[in-house]
Amino acid sequence: MNYFELFSLLPSYDVDTALLADRYRELQRAVHPDKFANASEQDKRLSVQRTAQINDAFQTLKNPIQRAEHLLALKGLELSHESTTLKDTQFLMQQMDWRESLEEIKHSDDPDSEIAELYDSFEQYAKHITAELKLLLVSELEADHLQAADQIRKLKFMAKLQDELTRVEDALLD
C-alpha cells in the first residue's frame, strides 16, 4: 500500500508534518470504530483494520527513516527486516571512533563538552547523509536506490548511536 496516496501526499522524503497530522485526523474521523457501533460485524472489523492501517501509515510517514524505507519499497526495494551490513569502511571507522568517544565520556573530566561535541558530530554527519539520501531517492536508477539503502542503514545506525549517547548522558545525571 502506498501510504503517500492514502494521505493524499506526493511521495517525497520531505513531508509537511502539519499537513500529515491534519490528514491523519481526517482519516481517523472517517473510519473511527465508534462511527460503526451500529454497523454489521464485517463493517466493524473493516473499520478496525482501516484504523490500524492509517495508524501504521502515519507512524511510517512521520518518521524520516521509515519514510525513506517506504519510498524505496515503492520503488521495489524492500529494507524492512533485513540484515545486510554496510561495507563502507570509512563509515565503519567513523563508527568505531564514535563508540570509543562514547566510552571515554564515562571517564572524562568534562563529560558535558564531550557529549555536546558528539551530538554535534552526529548531527553534522546525519545532515550530510540525509542530503545525499534525498537526491538518491528521487532517482529512477536501481544503483541509486541501492546507495539510498546504504544511506538509510547509516541513518539507522546513527539513531541507535544517538540513543546510546542519550543513555550515557542520562546516567551521568543520575
Swiss-Prot record:
Signal peptide: none
GO cellular component: iron-sulfur cluster transfer complex
Annotated ranges, domain J: 2-74
A GO molecular-function descriptor: ATPase activator activity
Listed NCBIfam families: hscB, PRK05014.1
Family: Belongs to the HscB family.
Lineage: Bacteria, Pseudomonadati, Pseudomonadota, Gammaproteobacteria, Alteromonadales
One GO biological process term: protein complex oligomerization
Subunit text: Interacts with HscA and stimulates its ATPase activity.
Listed transmembrane segments: none
Annotated function: Co-chaperone involved in the maturation of iron-sulfur cluster-containing proteins. Seems to help targeting proteins to be folded toward HscA.
A Pfam family hit: HSCB_C
Keyword Signal tagged: no
Gene3D superfamilies to which the protein is assigned, alphabetical: DnaJ domain, HscB, C-terminal domain
Protein name as it appears in the record: Co-chaperone protein HscB homolog
